[in-house]
Swiss-Prot record:
Keywords: Cell membrane, Cell projection, Coiled coil, Cytadherence, Membrane, Repeat, Virulence. HAT repeats lie at residues 148-166, 258-278, 300-331, 333-353, 477-497, 959-997, 1029-1067. It holds the Pfam family EAGR_box. This is Cytadherence high molecular weight protein 1. It comes from Mycoplasmoides gallisepticum (strain R(low / passage 15 / clone 2)) (Mycoplasma gallisepticum). GO terms for biological process: adhesion of symbiont to microvasculature. The gene is hlp1. Residues 179-207, 214-242, 374-387 have a biased composition (Acidic residues).
Amino acid sequence: MPKMIKGTEFIVAKKTKNKKKNHFEDIQTTNDINEEESEAIFGNLYDGADEVLPASLAYENGQLPEDGSIQVAFDADDNAYYISYDPENEIFIEPYEKYELDVSALYDAEGNPFDFFANYHVEGAETSQEEESGEYWEQFVGVEGYGYYDENEEWVWTGYFDEDNKFIPNEEEKPAEVEALEEESEATEEVVEQEPQEEVQAEEVVEEPVSQEQPEEEVAAEEYAEAAQEEYEEQPESEQEGSGEYWEQFVGVEGYGYYDENNDWVWTGYFDENNNFVPDQYYDEDAAVAGDEQVEEYSAQQEQVQEEYEQQPEQEGSGEYWEQFVGVEGYGYYDENNDWVWTGYFDENNNFVPDQYYDEYAQPVSEEQYSESVSEEQEPASEEQVAEEPAQVEEVAVEQVPEETQPEQVQEKVQAYEHVEEQQPEEVFADAIDEHYDEITHVEDKAVEEEQIQTDNVVSSDEINWSNYVGNEDYGYYDENNEWVWKGYFNEYGMFIPQEEDYTDSIPVDEQPVEQTADLAEQNEEEVIEETTASDEIVQVEEEVESEPVVPTVSDDLVALEQPFEFDTQQFVGNIDFGYYDESSEWIWTGHFDKDGKFFDFDGNLVYSPQEGVKPVEVPKPTDLTNQIPQNALVVAEPDVFSEDTIQQVDESQFDVGEELVVRGLLNPASTPVQPQELNIKPVFEEEKLNLPVLANEVSLQPQVDYSKRSDFDQLVTQTPVVLEDVVADDLISVDTKGFVPELSQPTFAPKAVSQDQFKLVQPVVSQPKFDQITHLTDEIKMDVNVTSSDVDVQPIQINPSLEVASEPSKLDIFVKKPAVELKKIEFIEPVSEKIDLQIFEQQEIVTKPVSTIQKPTYTDETVSVSVNAIDETTSETDTIVQVTPTTSEASDFDINKILNTKPVETITVELPKDEPKLVTGVHVSLVDVEAKPVEEIVKFDSPKPSVSEVVVEKEDKLTLVEEEPFFNKFIGNEQYGYYNNKNVWIWTGYFDDQNNFVSDKDSKTQKVDQLIEEFNKQEAIKKTEEVEAKKASEPFYNKYIGNKQFGYYNDKNVWIWNGYFDENDQFVPDQSWTKRSEKLIEDELQKQRIHELELELAQAQQAILESTKLKDQEVAKIKEEVLKVQQEAIKAKEVATLRNFVPKGSPLLNPAKEVENSMIVYQEDKLEVNDLRNELSKLKTQREEFDNFSKIRDLDVINLYNASTSHRGMDYVFSGFEKKEEQFVKKPLHFLEEVKADPVQVAKEETISNLDQLLKQDPHLLLAKKTDKSVSPQASLTVLADQKEVELTQQAVRKQAEAIEAERVDVIKPLEQVQLNQSRSLLDDLTPKFEVKPSLIKDDVIQPKYNDDLEPIEQLQFKQERSLLDDYMPKFDDQGLFSKVEFKLPTVNKEYRPKVEPIDVIKPLEPVRINKERSLLDDYLPPKLNAQPTFEKTELDLGLEKPLANGELYEELKAEFSTTITPADSKDMIDQLLEETNDLITSSTQTRSTKIHSFSKSPLKTEPEPILDTKFDDKFIELDENQGFDQLIVESDDELLTDVVQEQVSVNQIAVTNEEYKKDMAELKQFLEKRSEELFKQYFSKFEELTKLQMESFNQIKNELRSEMNEIRDEVRSNKLALTSEITEEIYPSAPKVSRKQRGVHGFSEPTSEFDFDNSLSLVNENNYDLYELLDRIINYEDVPLTSSNLFKAEEYQAKVKQSVYNIKLILKNSEAEATKNYNYILSTLKNEITLLQKDLPIISSQLNKLQHDLRAKQLNRGDYKFVQEQIQELRAEHANKTRAISFYNKKVSDLKSIYAQQIRKIKSDYKKISDLANKRKVSSDYIDQALQSFETARVSQPNIKRNYEQLYRNQLQQNVNANYGNFRRYDPLIENHGYEYFSNHQPREFFSELESIDNDIFSSNDLIYSNRNTYLDENFRINDYELTSNFNDIDAIYGMDKLRLPPFEPSNLVNDMEFNSSFDIDFDTDF
């Protein structure tokens, strides 16, 4: 069955033509595959079968099938695997586990790439090895039309195969071929009968096309040149792709060729572009004679085929229709058991449907398709011919064809060549032969050709020979990869021809055949190559430029990935249109590139389109690489430095569209090294679509071809004459290029291959060229490349085997991965024009053609051998690459000067002189074509001295049409599209669909599976739905209503009860009785509810009345009791007076909160004995409550004793510096100046004075508001509000000593009182609604209000005031709502029961339905200052707001407070007065709280009325949320801009902008604020870093001086022979940092760290500097040098120096403080200016708002105007809110700045104190170091698991470092001054320290985690998060916006002797820490 097998093999290959390609994977490439890819490709190699004998044992024991069906292969780790071949799927599998293996990753036992088919024998296959692994063209040996057998029974080709495996006949032999055809047809007829039906398959399909095409064979060339254009255009690529080559259908057809003795088909001609068969001109008569028998045999066969074909329709009907196709290639193959295996199936129409693995044939094989598939074979030939024939006409006197060229050889070689190339894209059972065939090395060596012609048969018989020599050192050697490298090659007769000078080094090991068959195949290839060139020379050189169809096999590395345009996006890096650099200098794209290279931003806007050139006529598909392939690249490379290819790309825009580049080459095939003397390439450019990175592919030069009709390519294909040395190993045949003289009257350029790594758009890139002589091209280049083999010093280059040259690479392929090779003896020499004759031709000689006819001319000259120029993507850095990306517009004229001017080295002529053998081993001039086949590195060979061949590239008048090869060929070699199996067969991993889009096989397989599953599921779903429908049909229709409550209900037994019935129309008729019953039930429920509500209201009213009537008597009685108790308990009346006049005067406060606290504390010195009070309270409870807040702290930002500022209100020391970052904005206690806000007030359990503690603790406002004067100035409009801790401490202060408070107490309250009195009184001022504010931290079990509703005195107070319409307004701010059902109708009741009724203390938020209605009432309200309306009556609003007063809480507290010294009569009036004023305060605070506006802190100068919101218009226009009713109560101007942030609270949903606009506004605001403040803080930090650095430098200088001084002392002491203590020595010369003292590594402290660490930079005294302080301390205290009589003098002298050092340090510290303060003042003033500017706008905005709202109220606006005004108002609100936010943000930054500055100053002062102590010989530092540091560092670092005694540590620090921590507060804190810090520490509750102990150890390592790291600070604190922007800004203002921002004055003292710091700077240490 040999023929059958061969045919099967052929068909299989054709089937996978789109998917697979013979190419052996390079080891490197394989290794590069990552694990996922590898597993995806060939499964997990390591999944072995447990139950099967291990493969390694089976291999050792020889327990494997003899037929080779199961073999053993080894991976790189020597793991053994069973492997077998699955011919059906054409994959290698593990036979037991059935998973796929990638043979390219496996090796045989000798370490050579594994070749399965070397040992794979199919039964009955006589030539099995050759067939399975042979070259593609081998199947055509013996095929009529491809050649003939000569008298020696040797096969002579009548043409050659191009790189697409298209057979190109030799035209000159046509006459002979015709004869041969006739003769052979007869012979064939006889033979055909004996041939298996397999060959017939093609013929069956052939008949129709044949009948059409045969007559056209004789048509004149010009005619079918035109026809070719039309017909070719009509035949879309997809059709060719899907159906196989056109010419395939003529294989076996008589007249087209014949079968040789090997049953290989030999064409006797070729197909032109119109698919017309053109007989070979060169057809050899001898061959014809030799092939007579075959011709006859074949003709008979052909007749038989035609008969069968005619009978086919009849047979289709019969049941055995398919039997006729058994044995027909394309339908299946014979397996190893000689059983026929179908590769598809017949559908019901008897159309053959191939399996999915044969993607190309995946369409039903109808008759039409048979013809198509066969035609596929014919296409290349016909295409070639069309291109060639016109070229004949154009031949000028360029055809200097050596006479010795033998047509036979040419023909035979061309035939073989075509076979080879035709086979490449397909999967054939190719052996290692494929690995070693290199199309690029089609070098013309006539002698070799002759040998090959003669020995073709010999080869086949001797195929086994050479594999026996593997391992024989005479024939080669093993390289470092343990791969066999031959020292020569076997010729056609199987004789080993050694290469000179160990050329084998340059042969990749993969080229070394694994089997003899591979070698023979390669020799056949060489044959083909040689013949090709020979015949090409005989033929017109133009025609060979045709090799563009050769382009099919794209190298592995072609950029035709699934994103076809894989251009280099790096060229856009740095372009601000495409992205930006982030902080880490990393480039961030602002969009993405699509597959076409277009750049879109993230919004989808097209930012950049690469279509800068003119669109080509035909836009390629995304998977079509043609537009990406580099245009013209001339590669001149030395073989020994093949990786250093100089690649040049010529910018197509430089060329005229019409210009044509014609390469005419006349090469002497017998001569070996070709030395092109001139290469004049005339460019023909078509407009180009994209300026995208283009792929450069080498293209071998072919004889000139006219490309005028070429409509497919718009890129100039480059032509590269390749000069190789002769005596070529298997795949490289050298050509002597001395005669290679390309000429062109057009300015020439040297195109160069381009590696895809170096693509840049538009910009040509030049990688360092390293050739000996490089001259800039001007308009024309003559290139002499003269190399003789004797001149050449061949340096072998080892090539790894995975991408084998012989694996059917293409001349066009340069994109093959190749290992990086060191360049040897290559220098980049300055341009030398010696040997380069630059001729400038006249432009007039350019012949332009219409643009439409030229698309992508491909210039290839196959007469010139093309070297394998593999440019590895990874190693392409070493390649010299000149890229000029072609961008051609129709109008652009080609001007080579444009190219030359763009870059100095854009065009490079490489001159390789003869006389420098070590520099030149042969010049490879490769042309980069549109597609390139995978090729390995350039391999150098030594060769006999060559004769000269000439290639003349000459301008032609006529443009030749280049035939298009299948588009997919260009993807062969691209790993994204497939891979090479171990046979070097290209395996596609997918297929191309009708749109030429590549569909991944993985996808397709899974898709098909998915489709099957989907269909399965669909069918199941359909079945289910049918079943369901059937069920539904059976079910009553009404079942679907079960469960619908409109139709019934479930009873208690869960049985469905219908509420009605369905009538005959299936309409539901409800049961009337049920409906009525349900309605009645509902009505009853509602009625009950209403009754209940009414009863509730009545009960409430009655209760209020009763309570109010009882109130007076009860309270009088209570007051009497309390007065008696207090009189008994109180010792001095004076003490009570202190309570009455508690507050100090309101002088300008540094920080009012702090001042109050301090003044309170001061009065503790008065000896008020409050032991009784204390005994009343449980101390533990008090402490627990005190630190309630503390225990809730998580995520501490600041815990350090240095910077945790104190709130010393009373005995206890409280950390107020713990803040959660988010809580800063929401829950932080308000320490600063701000408006008064009422906290919920709760009544103490008892009325005794013992509850005063809780009372004070609970609400400090009561204390502050106790005694108010009515004569205070309006300036003090802001009140001090204490937080919980302040209350606690205040209470303690009162407890302790209250005497001293008397004098100043009134003054603090005055501001509060005055504010109220300066406003015209309104009843609203007295309202104190209970709001749901943050709950008091005091435990409920401690304080339980005893009385809820007693406040009769208040009623009297309120009766004095006028009723207001507002009184009826009942705002509902509380969640608990007992008023939810009360209609807004109670004013009459109020009037009636006014004295007695009090509302319940819970106020529920208004129902949304009533909000607008009630707001409308509120809108009439003007604050009393502006329009006090005495006529207003008291209404429900007053009732609601009075609740806290009414329920007696406030009264009880005040009563308890005053009852000690006030008689009952007095106390009533006093309390009334106090309550009145307090109500005023609370009311104001309430309004403010509700409106988020400081409505009461107005300047008396204000004249504008306050804005009033009027919502009486149609609610359709105004949809207000809860807060909006108050939004307009805006303060237009403030007393102090920096003090009051006028904030209009606008919730997000009120801003009438779209969400996007709002986000945009917020983003802009964020960006502005962040940028501005970050600039300032960066400036601040940099200044301080600079200061710190200077400080440290000075410091180090002092330290060094001290050490040198110490050194002198030490020497003197030693000279006096005094004993030195080890301590001294170690301290002076520390051998290593002491763990306890120098934790941070002293040695490195002076180097600035990359991060700014406040801990180490702000303080001179830190762990990095302890050594200096200790040193000073020891020196000062005479510890280092024992004082004796001998060294006393020296010690004193030394002490003087030490004191000078101390002085210097103090000076440095002093200057540091001055600089830090100066820097701080600058930044602070800048921030304040920002705030001021922002605040100036707020009143303007407010006034505009007022005006607009006045217009809304006062004017009757039409609907349009009304809407416009509303929009304006919303915009103003948004602006107001944004500016307010900005102010809040800046205020926060001011606060941060203060915090940082406070740390800095604190540390400087701390250092200063330490130095002062040292100088005064106070041994503080050693105590500090021994104790504090020990507990800090040893516990933290040395023994991190030991729990530290924080309490002891705390006390140590407090005792020993008073000034360091809190010296700044001494003047504020007399208690600290008098009692010392131990007092504080002793009074800290136990929980304080237990909390500390839970803190992470490292917290103490930095002073403040927020600020410990500069970059962290900047990152975290200058990014406004959305939370900040949307949360309650009034809270932020409360924290940051309310305090008066002051510049701390700094008064530098010039008196150095007075080193004490001025204590005048007043940073708010308290609030931020």
